[in-house]
């Protein structure tokens, strides 16, 4: 138990790998048809654009990338969802570690990965998935800006907000 306490980042990487692998396996093994929104996003991915009637383009770009890699099966369309949630949790760890400490970062990331909303969202591809990634990226940049005068953090903040806006317009509330 002492080793686990002394190496939270290693434990976190193991948790990321196990949780993400389980979610990817669940995508492949669960015969869940696309929901109406997911089907609409998939149809957008067939004709990429800079934006659509009701949503920005990021979701279509992600689906186009995943289907180019593995095909048009439902699990391929949703492929990036559990992967993005894994990255989002790790960025939450980085932000919480900067604001508090490594232990708080560990529990913040683990809580994010295990809450029912994230678990369910990992099985779907929606505009919330990439927006949460870029929202957490912007949060991490702000946390780093509190203690660093480096120019890279404001740039990362702008990138996070910009990509978040390309994911979901609700990023404006950030």
Spans of model-derived segments:
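Transmembrane-embedded, aromatic-rich helix segments that form part
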Residues: 155-159, 170-174
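Short helix- or helix-capping micro-motifs
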Residues: 16-19, 108-116, 161, 165
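Extracytoplasmic catalytic/substrate-binding loops of multi-pass membrane glycan-assembly enzymes
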Residues: 29-41, 50-65, 71-76
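Hydrophobic core segments of transmembrane alpha-helices in multi-pass, intramembrane catalytic enzymes
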Residues: 85-88, 112, 127-139, 174
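Short acidic/glycine- and proline-prone juxtamembrane loop motifs at membrane-interface regions
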Residues: 117-131
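Start-transfer (signal-anchor) and selected internal transmembrane alpha helices
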Residues: 1-23
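Transmembrane-helix motifs of polytopic, lipid-linked glycan transferases
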Residues: 79-100, 137
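Membrane-interface transmembrane helices that cradle and orient dolichyl/undecaprenyl
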Residues: 97-103, 138-153
């Amino acid at each position: 138990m002492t080793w686990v306490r002394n190496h939270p980042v290693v434990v976190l990487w193991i948790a990321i790998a196990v949780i993400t692998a389980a979610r990817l396996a669940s995508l492949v093994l669960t015969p869940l048809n696309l929901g109406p929104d997911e089907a609409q996003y998939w149809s957008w991915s067939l004709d990429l654009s800079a934006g659509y009637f009701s949503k920005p383009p990021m979701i279509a770009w992600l689906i186009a990338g995943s289907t180019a890699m593995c095909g048009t099966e439902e699990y391929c369309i949703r492929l990036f969802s559990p992967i993005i949630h894994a990255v989002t949790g790790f960025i939450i760890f980085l932000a919480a570690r900067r604001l508090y400490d490594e232990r708080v970062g560990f529990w913040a990331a683990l809580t994010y990965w295990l809450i029912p909303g994230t678990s369910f969202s990992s099985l779907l591809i929606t505009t919330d998935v990439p927006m949460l990634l870029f929202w957490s990226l912007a949060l991490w940049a702000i946390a780093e800006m509190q203690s660093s005068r480096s120019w890279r953090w404001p740039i990362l903040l702008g990138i996070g907000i910009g990509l978040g806006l390309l994911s979901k317009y609700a990023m404006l509330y950030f």
